[in-house]
Amino acid sequence: MSRRKQAKPRSVKVEEGEASDFSLAWDSSVAAAGGLEGESECDRKSSRALEDRNSVTSQEERNEDDEDVEDESIYTCDHCQQDFESLADLTDHRAHRCPGDGDDDPQLSWVASSPSSKDVASPTQMIGDGCDLGLGEEEGGTGLPYPCQFCDKSFIRLSYLKRHEQIHSDKLPFKCTFCSRLFKHKRSRDRHIKLHTGDKKYHCHECEAAFSRRDHLKIHLKTHSSSKPFKCSVCKRGFSSTSSLQSHMQAHKKNKEHLAKSEKEAKKDDFMCDYCEDTFSQTEELEKHVLTLHPQLSEKADLQCIHCPEVFVDESTLLAHIHQAHANQKHKCPMCPEQFSSVEGVYCHLDSHRQPDSSNHSVSPDPVLGSVASMSSATPDSTPDPVLGSVASMSSATPDSSASVERGSTPDSTLKPLRGQKKMRDDGQSWSKVVYSCPYCSKRDFTSLAVLEIHLKTIHADKPQQSHTCQICLDSMPTLYNLNEHVRKLHKSHAYPVMQFGNISAFHCNYCPEMFADINSLQEHIRVSHCGPNANPPDGNNAFFCNQCSMGFLTESSLTEHIQQAHCSVGSTKLESPVIQPTQSFMEVYSCPYCTNSPIFGSILKLTKHIKENHKNIPLAHSKKSKAEQSPVSSDVEVSSPKRQRLSGSANSISNGEYPCNQCDLKFSNFESFQTHLKLHLELLLRKQACPQCKEDFDSQESLLQHLTVHYMTTSTHYVCESCDKQFSSVDDLQKHLLDMHTFVLYHCTLCQEVFDSKVSIQVHLAVKHSNEKKMYRCTACNWDFRKEADLQVHVKHSHLGNPAKAHKCIFCGETFSTEVELQCHITTHSKKYNCRFCSKAFHAVLLLEKHLREKHCVFDPAAENGTANGVPPTSTKKAEPADLQGMLLKNPEAPNSHEASEDDVDASEPMYGCDICGAAYTMEVLLQNHRLRDHNIRPGEDDGSRKKAEFIKGSHKCNVCSRTFFSENGLREHLQTHRGPAKHYMCPICGERFPSLLTLTEHKVTHSKSLDTGTCRICKMPLQSEEEFIEHCQMHPDLRNSLTGFRCVVCMQTVTSTLELKIHGTFHMQKLAGSSAASSPNGQGLQKLYKCALCLKEFRSKQDLVRLDVNGLPYGLCAGCMARSANGQVGGLAPPEPADRPCAGLRCPECNVKFESAEDLESHMQVDHRDLTPETSGPRKGAQTSPVPRKKTYQCIKCQMTFENEREIQIHVANHMIEEGINHECKLCNQMFDSPAKLLCHLIEHSFEGMGGTFKCPVCFTVFVQANKLQQHIFAVHGQEDKIYDCSQCPQKFFFQTELQNHTMSQHAQ
């Protein structure tokens, strides 16, 4: 998941002097405003509307900040032209500090407070006005901080520059089709257009505003919060943001600086006022001064004037201030045309228009008085409209006060009006004194609502404020001032006829003859007078009232459901329908036909508003239709709700004493007949109730409701996010939302287990924490690399210190030379004079030829040395011819020994393919073809004779030693390794001598043994007769200090590093023991010597069991069986049975090359599996005379070294490895990762030859390569499992290199 980096708005450049002067002047003006700066509801609303209207364009400039300098965000107030760094500061300034009008100019296309507008007017206005801003500083000049990029003008503010740039329409060719704004680049215009059409996924839960960015939503949410958690520690003033508080603290900081300065000038005055800088000698005088002149800075002052920001300590001082400072202001009564000079006089006069509450514990005083009190506290300087008193009295807001009525000595007495008492009193008459109490604290001695409102606004300003609802259109207003303006502009013509006092417009109580001017007064009267426990309403009515809210219902079940839902109560008293006293004609009230509790509304407009908001604009049920088509529910309401009917303007029927029926136009002379007639209408309509959708009739309202629910019920499945509670219509949308919003990509360091949230962070971490430097020390004479300086010193001591003038030594004759070129020229004098009689290999020295004969051809007779290098051996006197015998030896697959400790790069048992140009030999024809193509540029199939000399001469890479030429640099590099000889990297820890391989070092270390001629175990003193007993004793006496193998030689007590080294010790000690025993015994008795057949490698106790043959001057011994098969023309047939006292070993099937332990098993195998073969045809397949029988091809897993017979099995096995272990393979030596075991093996080979000058030597045949992958390919092609040197002590696996063993131990056998 990626998220684009959001732009940060750039701060506006302001001069230091200008900023300090503005801060001081601004904080002084704000300090004078006192605590009223957070209570202006008008400003809050304007800020909220400002934010909502510009939520789209406020995002654009922050995104454009990444590309264009002209699109950097700036926030400027459109009234006072002050710039701000963030939208939060601008919103706080507009809501609480801006001295200008809070209303936005509707003619501007972008509001000035939006960051997208940049205080820029509409482009059409700018072009029409000619950029005449009307101010001198906005016209621009020269040398100002913000120059125009299109002309020579510069401006003092960035906002002026943005306005000016819009006139350069030729330089801004891209125009927004939505708001006509101009842009310099198309990408800016396209990104801006997306803000008009893009999705806003961040919605405000308080209002319907939506934003495209989360930070814009956070800024917008601050406009809904009235809390100011940041308090000034000096003046206790609250702020909504830290930036506003810091700006305010600058004023106190300057006051402290002036205080320090004044203290130095006048040391006698110790106390100074923080507001006016007056000094006093005592704290009492300072406190008195603050209480008198600056009460807003005093902690004791908690009462604020409703007309101005002045704060006072007690009520008497506040009232005195109101009479003195605001005595000339006239206040009009909202109920009548009278005016008063003081607010208190208005409140006292309003008592004449209300009936006082019956209990001081009521939390709902008279709606008229409570609403007017709330109005006057919100807008004290505004003259209330006469309509406001009536409209506000119908609002649903509950005043924040409780009224306590005092009458005589019993303040809690219930005031019950007499039946014949007049409701409208004169102005001179007044009720008993009303005492008001605070609903939030224990104060109960407020003489008027004005004092109570002042107390609530100052002491309990953090309490939630009530909303005010218009009773005509049901719109909610934040303050009564807004409600007054709303009614005056929109509903003034509708409000007067309804709310005006007169003889023909009043509300009649159905329980008593009382009449009221508004429906709220009627509800209050019913709740007080007729809802008590002792009230006994008349019986026999079919309508019911709620005793808590005085709402009427048609059925008892509707009333019960209303009480449970609205008042969370089940035990409330139900009020039955009162008796109607018709003295005048009535007007109908309206009920919602779709609500279960059937609420009643006073006008069709209110009912329409209710249905539009709650029932999706369903048409009204009681429209002008015939009586048969009307809804039963609405008809029921119209008939059975005379309890809430209004009086009509005509009084003719009432004056005649008649009671007209509003359903059938009948008239009755007495009320009893009229009531009985209405019950007939009610019973007739309640018999059957029809569905308003399908006209189906139902017997009960419950069945009708259950049926009607089906028409409006739809089911849908939504998928909700558990984190943010957002709903989605499909699972795909939910998953996309979870991936986009609730998914994080983390980066895990496998070296130290730390987690990072970005790729850049982990790259920095790896570069700082895990990048270790490693120094290498190189010898300038031989270019060898060493990790430690001590190793280089030892190398110099043994290699270059003895003869510093001649540091290069010949490995054949020991002669030294001063330069490498002289050594290479000298090496050319050593030609390969000594040839092998069996495989045509040539060697530089006789010792190398003898070693080759012992290891490859099992020839240990020193008589072979007697023959010359190029001499012809004597012919054999036996039956078998030398040529046939040599062919038999070459064809036998078991004739050669293992490849261990071989110096040659080609196995003699494999076919040889020689290059007739340079003499290079290869085991495969493909390798020879690659060699000819790479080094001699001869393609397969071309005539070698015609191209041989020409292509040989064309080689551009020439060897400086032997003058041979090559076509590639790699071929020349590989050829040069043959002149340099094997590199000696293995040093003897006893004498310091170096050897080219670990095998030669092991053979050398044996010569340092002090127990050369002893064949006994030095631990248990038991004699050792064979190599098997030696190995068994070494396993019986393990070396716990040896962490590699766990073994040591029990004869010489040397520590061995591999199983191969242990076998070499056993062979060496047993051969010395056999030689010493034979020399010490006069009769030649002692350890019995075994003799092997040169063809089948069978062992015999007596030399007489073998027939001696001389082939090319070398003696060989063949058993009788091999001689018989040779005479019959067979090769490799069944061998004769071995002597009974010793089991035979090394029996193989000539057809499938399977090895058996005994001759009986081999014979049984031949009869079962190769029955069709006759003895004459049971020999091996005929082939070339120089090629033996090919071995069966097998496949070995590099990972676990398991062998498989076909390619499919190895593929399935490798696939299982990948499923179980994955495709990543780690090198435990350096923690690098590879995607295949072959690459890991190649990497481990590089570890083995670190610091070796870039050469790689085969540990088996010592062939030198310049690339590790070439050596790896060579090992796979030439050497097998039996040639591996290092054995794992904990499992049967073997390895060619020690680094392979170390990596295997750390990965598979780590504790």
Curated annotation (Swiss-Prot):
Q: Where is this protein primarily located? A: nucleus
Which keywords are on file for this protein? Activator, Developmental protein, Differentiation, DNA-binding, Metal-binding, Neurogenesis, Nucleus, Phosphoprotein, Repeat, Repressor, Transcription, Transcription regulation, Zinc, Zinc-finger
Q: Compositional bias (Basic residues) spans?
A: 1-11
Domain-related comment: Uses different DNA- and protein-binding zinc fingers to regulate the distinct BMP-Smad and Olf signaling pathways. C2H2-type zinc fingers 14-19 mediate the interaction with SMAD1 and SMAD4, while zinc fingers 28-30 mediate the interaction with EBF1. zinc fingers 2-8 bind the 5'-CCGCCC-3' DNA sequence in concert with EBF1, while zinc fingers 9-13 bind BMP target gene promoters in concert with SMADs.
Tissue specificity statement from the Swiss-Prot or TrEMBL entry? Expressed in brain, eye, olfactory epithelium, spleen and heart. Expressed in the basal layer, consisting of neural precursor cells and immature sensory neurons of the olfactory epithelium, but not in the mature receptor cells.
Where is this protein localized, as stated in its record? Nucleus
Give the matching Pfam families: zf-C2H2 (PF00096), zf-C2H2_6 (PF13912)
Q: Segment Disordered: which positions?
A: 1-21, 34-70, 95-123, 354-426, 617-654, 1163-1190
Q: What's this chain's function? A: Transcription factor that can both act as an activator or a repressor depending on the context. Plays a central role in BMP signaling and olfactory neurogenesis. Associates with SMADs in response to BMP2 leading to activate transcription of BMP target genes. Acts as a transcriptional repressor via its interaction with EBF1, a transcription factor involved in terminal olfactory receptor neurons differentiation; this interaction preventing EBF1 to bind DNA and activate olfactory-specific genes.
Q: Which Gene3D superfamilies match?
A: Classic Zinc Finger (3.30.160.60)
- Assembly with partners or alone: Homodimer. Interacts with PARP1, SMAD1 and SMAD4. Interacts with EBF1. Interacts with CEP290.
**Protein name as it appears in the record:** Zinc finger protein 423
Give the GO biological process terms.
Answer: brown fat cell differentiation; cerebellar granule cell precursor proliferation; cilium assembly; negative regulation of cold-induced thermogenesis; negative regulation of DNA-templated transcription; Notch signaling pathway; positive regulation of BMP signaling pathway; positive regulation of DNA-templated transcription
Biased composition (Low complexity) is annotated at 390-404, 631-642
What GO cellular-component annotations does this UniProt entry give? Answer: nucleus
Compositionally biased residues, Polar residues: 110-123, 373-382
- A GO MF term: identical protein binding
Renumbered to this chain, the Basic and acidic residues biased-composition regions fall at 41-54, 1163-1174
**In this chain, where does the modification Phosphoserine occur?**
55, 58, 631, 1081
The similarity comment for this entry is: Belongs to the krueppel C2H2-type zinc-finger protein family.
The record places its C2H2-type zinc fingers at 75-101, 146-168, 174-196, 202-224, 230-252, 271-294, 303-326, 331-353, 436-460, 468-491, 507-530, 544-567, 590-615, 659-681, 689-711, 719-742, 747-770, 777-800, 808-830, 834-857, 913-935, 957-979, 986-1008, 1047-1069, 1091-1109, 1147-1170, 1195-1217, 1225-1247, 1256-1279, 1286-1309
